């Protein structure tokens, strides 16, 4: 049976700044689990498999089974059902809240955070499998049980047509189909294994033109593996790292996720590295293409991309740029004397790779550059300490649920989920009852603040200050983020108002000042806040976005969510510490509020870039403006936002927005106009904040009916469609949202609507 280990090290090759707080790793123990446990797990797996085409999202049941043993519930209060809004009383809401928080508290780990599934993208695991296969570490790192669960996951998320999507709910793409087919082959599956699944996968690939039509990221992965030629790639010259920083196209000016992925890619491209050519590789060269491998026109293949993958088609200027670099510059850099420059660029690239590895304790900023950096360290020296330090950190990215083992989009969402959960529980006003839960959450948040800047000259490494920030996941990861810092600060400020004998000692004021300093340092000239850093270049740089699958990746754009979170945190801070940097904070809030007003769409919504979608963005838009001192009466933006939200309420009383809203930028309901507990939570929170109850509380009562009746027998809420997103087009799982936002919305509803009536 699989066991979730929390905050444990266990390897001499692991480094940590805070004793591994927040680390979550699944380990298989053959001796663990009674026959009843194993039967329950098998039932969950079979149930997922049988319904995989209608319910594509797992419900994180293995973790729930694990915690039911570790943190059993003392009592399960009887479920409440309400027929109509007349049945919604303070007592029914309180019971629903207690049932929900009782259950959610059992999912809290001993270090105070809420673990959970952060999977969703389907292009992450293949990168890991390819890297481990090339380096010969596949069987050493992934046990037979790991490999079995990874195969289960890949087969479970194969679409009916035989292909694989960009993410678990998406239609088949060439990027997803080729990479997942290749991953299965490298994991030991034969070309005709299973009940025709491999054949169906191959038929989808060949029926859509073959692997020459894969996206640029896919071309790079296939090239290092040896099943595609480097000459079929558009150039990724490492020399870009030698350009002066003053140029707008310098990678140091790009969004950190973008530059940190293209950094190791440029190293591998500069070296034209190809892994060992094995019989499986030779076989894949035959399996993936519609014509013999040696007959492929690689120059023509450079710009081929399947229409299913084409979210961001290359503008003409990009095709001209890549063709010029490919034809004229690359031949010079591949031969003496130009080769000297190439060697210098490769040396610079690997220095930046090592800096990133060292300062994230070998977690790296995300899963894509994690495995690429690991491969680069092996290419530089297969016996290097750096490669060995990378290996144990692979497990930080692996998560298992009833659909199998997946690679997550980060090493988890620990701080983010814990900060939200603390705010949600506090909103319920049941603070004393859940004091132990809040105390543990408080401890986790305090232990996860980043206490130092990265070492050395930050400008040399293109890094922003970190001291005082909160990361998305763990202190070991350490990359500072504007909204994570804001949500962390909001949570500790709320907790500081509660008696320390209930929730523990408050955070030292100096550490609060450090957090405020980070937030203030991240405001752009237009008043908006981007994610990790300031916006360092121009939007026209998107013209050279080479990733056909993703939108808006080249620079760190300002977002309504980050801007709103910053306003909320600074407003909360200002109330408790009115003397600290008062004028700067006030000026920052005013500029940020003006940015939010400017970015509102004509229909009253805001586009959400990190959650689905207009419901999420509009919750942040409204919350930010209200925190800045505006109200329904004096702000037309808030009035329009309320109108927008009310126009989307469904007959069931809830809201339900599809991920299609994100990619198409047009509001779309979930299929069959079903409501969703998470969207409903966001919409309720926005409307309650905008004092909807004073005008007409009926929409809020109807939403409360939907949430109360959605609660499951054990106090959990159902896992519905996927609710997280990044880069406009790729969806990601936030497993805790189904619990956090119904709790938060009903908590606010109880004390700001029912108790104030």
From Swiss-Prot:
One GO cellular component term: lipid droplet
Expression across tissues: Expressed in thickened roots and root nodules.
Repeat as UniProt keyword: yes
EC nos: 5.4.99.8
Organism name: Glycyrrhiza glabra (Licorice)
Keywords on record: Isomerase, Repeat
Annotated PANTHER family: LANOSTEROL SYNTHASE, TERPENE CYCLASE/MUTASE FAMILY MEMBER
GO terms (BP aspect): triterpenoid biosynthetic process
Gene3D superfamilies associated with the record: 1.50.10.20
Pfam families, sorted: SQHop_cyclase_C (PF13243), SQHop_cyclase_N (PF13249)
Induction field: No effect of methyl jasmonate (MeJA) or gibberellin A3 (GA3).
Active site feature: 483
Alphabetical list of SUPFAM superfamilies matching this protein: Terpenoid cyclases/Protein prenyltransferases
InterPro entries: SQ_cyclase_C (IPR032696), SQ_cyclase_N (IPR032697), Squalene_cyclase (IPR018333), Terpene_synthase_CS (IPR002365), Terpenoid_cyclase/PrenylTrfase (IPR008930)
Record family assignment: Belongs to the terpene cyclase/mutase family.
Catalytic activity reported: (S)-2,3-epoxysqualene = cycloartenol
Name recorded for this polypeptide: Cycloartenol synthase
Keyword Repeat attached: yes
Intervals holding PFTB repeats: 147-188, 512-557, 589-629, 638-679, 700-741
Function: Oxidosqualene cyclase converting oxidosqualene to cycloartenol. Required for the production of sterols.
GO MF annotations in UniProt: cycloartenol synthase activity
């Amino acid at each position: 049976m699989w066991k979730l280990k929390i905050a444990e090290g266990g390897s001499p090759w692991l480094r940590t700044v805070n004793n591994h707080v927040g680390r979550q790793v699944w380990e298989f123990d053959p001796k663990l689990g009674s026959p009843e446990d194993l039967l329950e797990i098998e039932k969950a797996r079979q149930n997922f498999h049988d319904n995989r085409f209608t319910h594509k999202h797992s419900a994180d049941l293995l973790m729930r089974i694990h915690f039911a043993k570790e943190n059993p519930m003392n009592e399960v209060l009887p479920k409440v059902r309400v027929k109509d809004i007349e049945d919604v009383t303070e007592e029914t809401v309180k019971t629903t809240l207690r049932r929900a928080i009782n259950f959610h508290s059992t999912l809290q780990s001993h270090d105070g955070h809420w673990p959970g599934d952060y999977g969703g993208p389907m292009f992450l695991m293949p990168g890991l499998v390819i890297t481990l296969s090339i380096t010969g570490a596949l069987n050493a790192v992934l046990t037979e049980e790991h490999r079995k669960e990874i195969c289960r996951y890949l087969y479970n998320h194969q679409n009916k047509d035989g292909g694989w999507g960009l993410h678990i709910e998406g239609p088949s793409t060439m990027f997803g189909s080729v990479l997942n087919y290749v991953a299965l082959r490298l994991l030991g599956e034969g070309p005709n294994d299973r009940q025709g699944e491999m054949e169906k996968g191959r038929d989808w690939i060949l029926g859509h033109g073959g692997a020459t039509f894969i996206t640029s990221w896919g071309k790079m992965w296939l090239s290092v593996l040896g099943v595609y030629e480097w000459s079929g790639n558009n150039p990724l010259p490492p020399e870009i790292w030698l350009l002066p920083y003053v140029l707008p196209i310098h990678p140091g000016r790009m969004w950190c996720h973008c530059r940190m992925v293209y950094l190791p890619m440029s190293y591998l491209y500069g070296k034209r590295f190809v892994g060992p050519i094995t019989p499986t590789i030779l076989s894949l060269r035959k399996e993936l293409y519609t014509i013999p491998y040696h007959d492929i026109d690689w120059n023509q293949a450079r710009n081929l991309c399947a229409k299913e993958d084409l979210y961001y088609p290359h503008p003409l200027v990009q095709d001209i740029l890549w063709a010029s670099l490919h034809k004229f510059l690359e031949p010079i850099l591949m031969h003496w004397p130009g080769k000297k420059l190439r060697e210098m660029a490769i040396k610079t690239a690997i220095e930046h790779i090592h800096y990133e590895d060292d300062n994230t304790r070998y977690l790296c900023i995300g899963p894509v550059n994690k495995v690429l950096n690991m491969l680069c360290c092996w290419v530089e020296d297969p016996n290097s300490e750096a490669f060995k330090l990378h290996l144990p950190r692979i497990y930080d990215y692996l998560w298992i649920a009833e659909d199998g083992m997946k690679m997550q989009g980060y090493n988890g969402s620990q701080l983010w989920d814990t900060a939200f959960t603390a705010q949600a529980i506090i909103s319920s006003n049941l603070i004393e009852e859940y004091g132990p839960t809040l105390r543990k959450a408080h401890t986790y948040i305090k232990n996860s603040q980043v206490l130092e800047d990265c070492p050395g000259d930050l400008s040399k490494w293109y890094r922003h200050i970190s001291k005082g920030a909160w990361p998305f996941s763990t202190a070991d990861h350490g990359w500072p983020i504007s909204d994570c810092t804001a949500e962390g600060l909001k949570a500790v400020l709320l907790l500081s108002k509660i008696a320390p004998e209930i929730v523990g000692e408050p955070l030292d004021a100096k550490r609060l000042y450090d957090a405020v300093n980070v937030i203030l340092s991240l405001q752009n000239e237009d008043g908006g806040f981007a994610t990790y850093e300031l916006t360092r270049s121009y939007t026209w740089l998107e013209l050279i976005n080479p990733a056909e699958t993703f939108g808006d990746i080249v620079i760190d754009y300002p977002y309504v969510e980050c801007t709103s979170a910053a306003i909320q945190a600074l407003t909360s801070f200002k109330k408790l510490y009115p003397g600290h940097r008062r004028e700067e904070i006030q000026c920052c809030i005013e500029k940020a509020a003006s940015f939010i007003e400017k970015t509102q769409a004509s229909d009253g919504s805001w586009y959400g870039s990190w959650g689905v979608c207009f419901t999420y963005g509009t919750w942040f838009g409204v919350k930010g403006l209200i925190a800045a001192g505006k109200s329904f009466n004096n702000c037309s933006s808030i009035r329009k936002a309320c109108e927008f939200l009310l126009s989307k309420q469904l007959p069931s009383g809830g809201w339900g927005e599809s991920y299609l809203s994100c990619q198409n930028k047009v509001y779309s309901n979930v299929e069959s106009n079903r409501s969703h507990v998470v969207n409903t939570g966001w919409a309720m929170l926005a409307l309650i904040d905008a004092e909807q109850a004073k005008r007409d509380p009926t929409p809020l009562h109807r939403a409360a009916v939907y949430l109360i009746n959605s609660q499951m027998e054990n106090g959990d809420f159902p896992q519905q469609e996927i609710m997280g997103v990044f880069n406009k087009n790729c969806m990601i799982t936030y497993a805790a949202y189904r619990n956090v936002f119904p709790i938060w919305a009903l908590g606010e509803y109880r004390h700001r609507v029912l108790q104030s009536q």
